């Protein structure tokens, strides 16, 4: 039976650059909990986030607010896959179901670098979930996100049913002439879109990777980078496409394998590090079933 007292977990974090690398200040409220931070390559603060309740039901909310001060570096990930449980028809008070929501907001200062790489989201049958990602960064800031959603527990022959997944991504640049849109990406997938030929054509895994680069990419460089990313699709199953943004790139995955989605996105992650002459990323200790060492 659906709880009558939905959660509203919050996480407010500020990252600052220090002599020994980037550090964080702030904290979380239940059901969110911070795990032990580690120092990664280039002084990056690697911080896993745990959802102690095990998943979200209708009415639950998560609010994550991130601030990166000048020259700070952060990798924020999650300890496990996020589960969204069915809502429609589970409550006599709300028979049509209620939405679970997640809001992530990030403000980046000069020469800062944020990698937002949560583990996959699993949407159960009849679940309603809306996620919003809002990022503001300077011209020399870098932001990378990769999010994967599995629409229905396919191993149990489950589909979305009457459920629905919504996503709204907004990325803006601060320029000398004001704010400039880098990306506005709004998506909604219901069971019709999941099954439809002009939708996902019954492919239950969908993912998006976005990189807002810290510098303009010349035409030759971005074309070579996209060619390398397309080559990285070898031996992976699914439909994988990528393209350029005004100052960065976007990649999409649709298919049947969340593992292959993770592999491809992780290879792209390594490419973005390489493009900035940074050390190749190492797999966070909380990630399972991951390709190692990372290509390239």
From Swiss-Prot:
<comment type="subunit">
    <text>UreD, UreF and UreG form a complex that acts as a GTP-hydrolysis-dependent molecular chaperone, activating the urease apoprotein by helping to assemble the nickel containing metallocenter of UreC. The UreE protein probably delivers the nickel.</text>
</comment>
<keyword id="KW-0996">Nickel insertion</keyword>
<dbReference type="InterPro" id="IPR002669">
    <property type="entry name" value="UreD"/>
</dbReference>
<dbReference type="GO" id="GO:0005737">
    <property type="term" value="C:cytoplasm"/>
</dbReference>
<protein>
    <recommendedName>
        <fullName>Urease accessory protein UreD</fullName>
    </recommendedName>
</protein>
<keyword id="KW-0963">Cytoplasm</keyword>
<dbReference type="Pfam" id="PF01774">
    <property type="entry name" value="UreD"/>
</dbReference>
<comment type="similarity">
    <text>Belongs to the UreD family.</text>
</comment>
<keyword id="KW-0143">Chaperone</keyword>
<dbReference type="GO" id="GO:0016151">
    <property type="term" value="F:nickel cation binding"/>
</dbReference>
<comment type="function">
    <text>Required for maturation of urease via the functional incorporation of the urease nickel metallocenter.</text>
</comment>
